[in-house]
């Protein structure tokens, strides 16, 4: 018994010391949390009773060069529910199903979800939003928002693009200039009680949104409209698969029009054209059909340019001194290269002709001869110098690149076919940009649509054009000689259907058979520019798989002629010329 007393005392001391240690530790922890971590936990406590709401910024508009609005904003509503504020869930569900056209299952799932705020539907028209707001049902929130609206529906749809449900750019310029157009969202911080109900006495903290900037582009809505109407007309008349018309300024690369028919409805971009059985498609098939509908063949697709490429062959040959205008050629209707007979469009041949006449006649044997004179290395280096082997750098996403033989794979047959525009592929925008650079005095241009952006109040204007080096790719003398030859093509040669009364027009026709050969499918095109001695505008018309007559000089040249007849008087810089006035060489 005597032995147990010291043991109990020791036990009590140990327990006492342990209690002191535990209490000291707890005290230290409390001091640490209350003093050193006070700010952190105050912030957490504040977060528990704060609700953050975003304020949408108004998206910048897209306007043509003259200030015509092509993409605008339409005020709409976003309908949401706040779970903790709902007193009559069934009434809320019934109202939202009725007004928004949603299924009960969809609405109930969102209404019964425990969250601070749950979006039910966006892009609701103002009238419907007002009707919902006036019911006064607790827990329903109606916020003003914006959705994209395109006043001209399908005008330049493949250039402008569209936005998604969150108003973010998806395609074309809407996507490329997202950073300029989108602006910055604002913010509202509200104090709430434990149930998430806003405390009106506490007020709110607010950061105003910054609206997006307006984007001005080089398109001229009037020229675009006329080009698009012409493309639709010829597409219908020739029962063609599609028609593209490009109009640009060869001096600086500004695109005045880019039509690629059929265009699509910008305000309803997910609906396929009539005639396509959408209801019978799988999701994958429908997406593929939509992607095809949205594609811009001027930029996204390549093709064999055919005889229009002879402009580039001529420029390279003249610049390298392998041909002169007066050089004589013989055309029996074909030319043999390494045992392969390459035919001319004129089966009986053109007989004796000089280089200018060979270009006017679009004679394949003449251009094969010239190409072989240059040789593969010289021709390839010329194409490289002209910028033909790179992308143009146009400010629209998805530009395709040139598909060309590797330099060491170009033999005599390949060189022969390249010289008249076959066995390789380029984009229409590349052809238009390269020819523009060759006829403008020899300076490479970058085709573009963006001009500048500015705040909606006009207080700040910023150029969006990418600075590019003004690279000389051809001498001014060769450029002038080339323009003179192409003027003769329209005045007295195969391009005479592109002639415009009162103006001097230069140009080149083209007719190319699509791959695989022998299917009877052709691409007809005509490239024209005016005035011939000092070009201010260039147009390229491409008709894919026209039915009936398919020669470029007969079906595409008249389209450019009609285009020029209507837009040349409209362009201030173009001067009228007397019918018999000759082109001036510079």
Can you say where each PLM-predicted feature lies in the sequence?
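Periplasmic/cell-envelope proteins involved in peptidoglycan metabolism and beta-lactam response
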Residues: 1-277, 302, 324, 377-389, ...
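Beta-lactam-recognizing serine transpeptidase/beta-lactamase-like catalytic domain environment
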Residues: 71, 193-204, 250-308, 312-545, ...
